[in-house]
């Protein structure tokens, strides 16, 4: 299905995939490898209450420039194994 403005929804039994794409280059792909969400610009996830990300094995967060983590109340970082903090300069408090 494709609209005149370039929005596409593709259901493929042959490829076993569902692909949704808009004219701005934003894409959602569901296939046997998983779910891929791709944004040509910003990607925002917003929840009116709690949000949770759970991975069965590893979870990687990577930013080309800066990564900021903040909380208005408390923040906890914990691991049952070794915790490593690396940086050219590490400042605590």
Q: What residues fall within each predicted segment?
A:
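Right-handed beta-helix
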Residues: 1-93
């Amino acid at each position: 299905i494709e609209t005149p403005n370039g929005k596409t929804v593709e259901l493929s039994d042959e490829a076993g995939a569902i692909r949704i794409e808009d004219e701005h280059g934003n894409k959602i792909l569901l296939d046997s490898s998983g779910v891929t969400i791709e944004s040509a610009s910003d990607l925002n996830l917003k929840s009116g209450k709690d949000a949770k990300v759970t991975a069965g094995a590893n979870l990687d967060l990577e930013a080309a420039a800066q990564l900021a983590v903040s909380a208005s109340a408390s923040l906890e970082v914990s691991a049952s194994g070794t915790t490593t903090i690396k940086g050219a300069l590490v400042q605590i408090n």
